[in-house]
Amino acid sequence: MKEIVLAGGCFWGVEEYMSRIEGIVETKVGYANGIKENPSYEEVCSGVTGHAEACYIKYDESIISLEELLNKFWSIIDPTVLNKQGNDRGTQYRTGIFYLDEKDLNVIIKSKYQEQKNYRKPIVTEVEPLKCFYEAEEYHQKYLKKNPGGYCHIHLD
């Protein structure tokens, strides 16, 4: 099994979208690459912790490759917008690809390069090693499964 953490705006929609993909075996939402240990949702939303709302993904590489997974990720975000996705604004809504395995970096860089060909503006999606990931509060986990019709900036149909 492989792991990656993806930030694409509000984590509810990213998790719901990713959980529907064949080969994804586990998803969790949380806060990635900030400066405060174990922050609360309110602290992250204040913008002072530096965390991104993100989705931890465990996937079966024999069913879906990282390249395929990233292609699906690119399709649900606007990678040219800084600190904003849909109606959500703030540093916690930035886009990012946070890797746990250094061997994945070449695939990520190649994928970002290929995606850039679709845009005139530069892609601002961060590509960094995962420094930290704190699981979000339980009520955020599988939020759109628990609350069908809840807010989502991603078209899930």
UniProtKB/Swiss-Prot annotation:
This is Peptide methionine sulfoxide reductase MsrA. The lineage of its organism: Bacteria, Bacillati, Bacillota, Clostridia, Eubacteriales. The keyword Transcription does not apply. Pfam families: PMSR. The keyword ATP-binding does not apply. Keywords: Oxidoreductase. One of its GO terms (biological process) is cellular response to oxidative stress. InterPro entries: Met_Sox_Rdtase_MsrA_dom, Met_Sox_Rdtase_MsrA_sf, MsrA_MetSO_reductase. The active site is at C10. SUPFAM superfamilies: Peptide methionine sulfoxide reductase. It comes from the Bacteria. Belongs to the MsrA Met sulfoxide reductase family. Has an important function as a repair enzyme for proteins that have been inactivated by oxidation. Catalyzes the reversible oxidation-reduction of methionine sulfoxide in proteins to methionine. One of its GO terms (cellular component) is cytoplasm. It catalyses: L-methionyl-[protein] + [thioredoxin]-disulfide + H2O = L-methionyl-(S)-S-oxide-[protein] + [thioredoxin]-dithiol; [thioredoxin]-disulfide + L-methionine + H2O = L-methionine (S)-S-oxide + [thioredoxin]-dithiol. Its EC number is 1.8.4.11.
